Amino acid sequence: MLLSWYIDPDILLKLGIATLIGMVIGLERELKNKPLGLKTCIVIAVSSCMLTIVSINAAYHFPKYYRIMMDPLRLPAQIISGVGFIGAGVILRKSNDVISGLTTSAMIWGAAGLGLATGAGFYKEAFASLLFILISVEFLPWVVRKIGPDRLQEKDIRIRMSLSDKDKMTEILKEMKRRDIKAHSVRIDDLGEKDFPIMEVKVRVHKNRYTTDVYYDIKAIEGVVGVKCDTL
């Protein structure tokens, strides 16, 4: 059988749409300086689309010659599992116990899913899903922050303080409250291994309040020797 270089225009259309979808998702992540970029998303979407095309076409092509029954969606099912490993690679646990990369991991899985849908010929469904994903990631959080509960208007800061006198801990917490710095978690380290007792506090403040301002407020409290602040 002679090798033919002819490619079905419908296949080229599917690959082109998958490229466009991957480009949109990749740009959204790259503009936010996330580990998932433009090239990665395009590769995932196009590869998923291509493997879906191969799987479906092979399932209906080879039985004519070899009488082999094949599941047209067997290969795409393995894509979802394989992409999961890539998604796990962008989930990070930072030193301040904050988990990041979950949305990026979900976007990887989404790019693969949209590539599968495109490869199977569901163009309109793929574009509709892309639109809903972008609305959910970009627009919906802004709306929720505007009309949602006050908790969404706050941010968490972890403060580690060295104290000159362990008997002033309660007074320091009361003074923090007067300065509108609400503590919701307190940890005390006074095992005698350090020169000063340590108090670690997780606080909530308005999201527009600078972490440096919180630092200055804590530093000004009587009995506080040293301060370390981390925005969570």
Swiss-Prot record:
Source domain of life: Bacteria
Chief place of localization: membrane
Pfam families assigned: MgtC
Keyword Membrane: yes
Keywords, alphabetical: Cell membrane, Membrane, Transmembrane, Transmembrane helix
PANTHER family: PROTEIN MGTC, PROTEIN SAPB
Family note: Belongs to the MgtC/SapB family.
Protein known as: Protein SapB
